[in-house]
């Protein structure tokens, strides 16, 4: 029992300086989103916001957490699926992610890092028909929430003491054989 108390006290002592070195940030981002399902892929524009905290640790390293809310214009439609003139579409909608970042301070103004964590995407599907079916409906839409994991890497440059720009590559793999490759540029502020 004493060993557990000693370990907890030691962890608390080391956590206090880490919290004191915490750096909060928020960013807006945009870039290329390539959504894939099965063998098909469709590119679109990815946009969103992220916020997080980085904690400096000894040796020029840092560890952090980041939450992201994004959306995409990636959409793929096929025509004449069940009848002439109909259309079936699949589109990548909102994307939520919570990741842990680990990296190194390359210089006073640059960071190189990798990250990984959980992601949840909403995928929309729709079917439009020029004729009414037996129930009187010609259109149908549905949304599916897919859980998955995200991995990636990034490079961040401080423009001023509070303003930064960064570039990231993100790979997300979800249920139902759905994945995304994203190249993102972000501009943010530290506070």
Where are these regions (language model features)?
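Gram-negative outer-membrane beta-barrel domains
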Residues: 4, 10-13, 17-191
């Amino acid at each position: 029992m004493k060993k557990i108390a000693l370990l907890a006290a030691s962890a608390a002592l080391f956590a206090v300086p880490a919290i004191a070195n915490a750096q909060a940030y928020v960013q807006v981002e945009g870039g290329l989103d390539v959504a894939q399902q099965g063998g098909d892929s469709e590119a679109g524009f990815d946009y969103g916001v992220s916020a997080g905290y980085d904690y400096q640790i000894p040796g020029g390293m840092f560890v952090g957490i980041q939450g992201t809310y994004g959306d995409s214009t990636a959409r793929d439609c096929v025509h004449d699926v069940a009848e002439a003139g109909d259309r079936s579409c699949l589109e990548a909608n909102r994307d939520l992610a919570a990741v842990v970042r680990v990296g190194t301070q390359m210089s006073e103004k640059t960071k190189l890092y990798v990250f990984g964590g959980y992601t949840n995407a909403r995928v929309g599907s729709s079917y439009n028909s020029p004729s009414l079916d037996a129930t009187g409906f010609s259109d149908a839409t549905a949304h599916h929430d897919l859980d998955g994991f995200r991995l990636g890497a990034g490079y961040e440059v401080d423009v001023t003491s509070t303003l930064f720009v960064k570039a990231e590559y993100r790979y997300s793999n979800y249920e139902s054989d759905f994945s995304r490759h994203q190249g993102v540029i972000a501009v943010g502020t530290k506070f």
